Amino acid sequence: IDNIQPHYTAVVIGSGYGGGIAASRLARAGQSVCVLERGKDVQARRYDLAAINKEHVVNPDSNYCFGEGGAGTYSDGKLYTRSKKRGDVQRIMEILVAHGAKDEILFDAHPHIGTNKLPKLVAELRESIEQAGGQVIFQTRVTDFLIEGSKLKGVRTQQSDVVEGRATI
């Protein structure tokens, strides 16, 4: 993998909303972050989705489940906010608004971003990670965890690259 550092504060596996928001918050806090995504970026992913729908050909690494933004990117755009393990839902909503969602999601009882808005939102989330000094690397599947003693030290990719971090998300 070009431009990969040997060690990061955090290695994030997957660029779904959870991984993207975690990486964005860490990068903006000045931490070194590397996001490893097995699928393609949101624009390139569209061609793989078209192949599924038109030709019935599925790329196992870039489809409705895998790729920038994860499974939520091509969902109906509804946000599930009723979890019993709430966390900081308001802060997450604010991050989504900062990256293109409408302000209404901050107070709607049933927040909805909209399918047509999600691809642009996830691309803007990636751009915010990169602008803050983080890296997002596509078409890179994590295949193994690197464990020394009882500590997780990093990951190995399908290309045999080793990516280490103090934390792995």
PLM region descriptions:
Residues 18, 39, 165-167:
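Glycine-/small-residue-rich beta->alpha transition segments that form the dinucleotide
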Residues 4-8, 158-167:
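Core beta-strand elements of the Rossmann-like FAD/NAD(P) dinucleotide-binding domain
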Residues 23, 27:
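Gly/Ala-rich phosphate-binding loop of Rossmann-like dinucleotide-binding domains
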Residues 1, 42-136, 140-141:
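Conserved N-terminal/central alpha/beta ligand/cofactor-binding core
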Residues 31-37, 42:
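Short beta-strand "acidic-cap" motif of Rossmann-like dinucleotide-binding folds
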Residues 2-18, 34-36:
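Beta1/beta-strand and adjacent pyrophosphate-binding region of the FAD-binding site
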Residues 138-153:
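A conserved short coil-to-beta-strand element within the FAD-binding core of flavoproteins
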